[in-house]
Amino acid sequence: MPGPMTLTGRYVTLAPLGAADVPALDAANRVSDAIWDYLPYGPFPDRAAYAAWVASVANRPDPRFYTLTPAGAEGPMGVASLMRVFPEHGTIEVGHICLAPALQRTRAASEMIYLFADWVFTAGYRRFERKSGAPNPPSPRGGQRVRLALPR
């Protein structure tokens, strides 16, 4: 099972989600309510509601949430999780990807997938999954950008 860990790449650092991340994430996420369109939560009416959501998910083992902080940024600009963890089947999925508009379609966002995939396979899992749905057009394009193409 993935635990609290920090993964650092050239363009982004992934770290466990916690209460200290709320101000930066809330500010980054207020730019566009559209980032919540395909998630089962959000947008949040105020920082207190966002903080309550973070408190409710921050220490869960599955899904395990991480922040994404681009190199040079003052704070995190997105979250993602490792979820649907089945060690007995050797599978794990990345999901709950919520990126501020400034982080979307960047090297940092692409590297997030690489860092998670590298950890997953190094930890001995055999399958790394990423949900992608037709109702969310940016999702398949994001998968193609990191060579996680849809099956034909």
Question: Where do the PLM segments sit?
Answer:
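Conserved beta-strand-loop-alpha-helix junction that forms the acyl-donor binding cleft
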Residues: 130-140
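Conserved GNAT acetyl-CoA-binding A-motif
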Residues: 122-132
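Alpha-helical, largely C-terminal catalytic domains
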Residues: 116
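GNAT-family acyltransferases
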Residues: 1-106, 119-123
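Conserved catalytic-core motifs of GNAT/GCN5-like acyltransferases
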Residues: 131, 149-152
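Short, conserved glycine- and acidic-residue-centered signature motifs
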Residues: 109
